């Protein structure tokens, strides 16, 4: 889990409701503290295969430095996303999302919007994982 998920969803609604809204310096401090001390759920560390061959391919493909950097970033992202551990999400995940929405205290709280944004946050890793394993860069 992302301990800052509810803070991110809160910020999304505040920006949606008021495009002029800006975070206060205290908001960043709260996010950092929450990120460091908050519950992260299950964490899996994996070592991915060596990418030296892919780096050689990139060097042969283009000599333009910015293009090389972007291609290297793409390879690294693909390796990370392909190695994701995707956990089953059932009723307890729905309960978790509802508990995160309950933590958001803002005027005109739009629970449907917040719920959608929280689910999107947690679905991106699944989408990225599926894309990475199908690409096989």
Can you annotate each of these PLM segments?
Residues 1-137:
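Membrane-interfacial terminal anchoring regions of lipid-handling membrane enzymes
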């Amino acid at each position: 889990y992302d301990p800052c998920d509810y803070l991110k969803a809160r910020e999304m609604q505040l920006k949606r409701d008021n495009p002029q809204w800006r975070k206060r310096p205290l908001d960043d401090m709260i996010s950092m503290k929450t990120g460091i001390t908050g519950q992260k759920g299950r964490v899996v560390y994996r070592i991915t295969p060596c990418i030296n061959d892919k780096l050689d391919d990139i060097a042969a493909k283009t000599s333009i430095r910015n293009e090389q950097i972007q291609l290297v970033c793409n390879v690294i992202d693909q390796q990370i996303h392909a190695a994701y551990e995707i956990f089953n999400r059932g009723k307890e995940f729905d309960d978790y999302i509802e508990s995160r929405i309950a933590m958001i205290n803002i005027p005109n709280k739009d629970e449907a919007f917040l719920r959608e944004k929280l689910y999107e946050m947690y679905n991106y890793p699944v989408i990225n994982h599926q894309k990475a394993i199908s690409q096989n860069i």
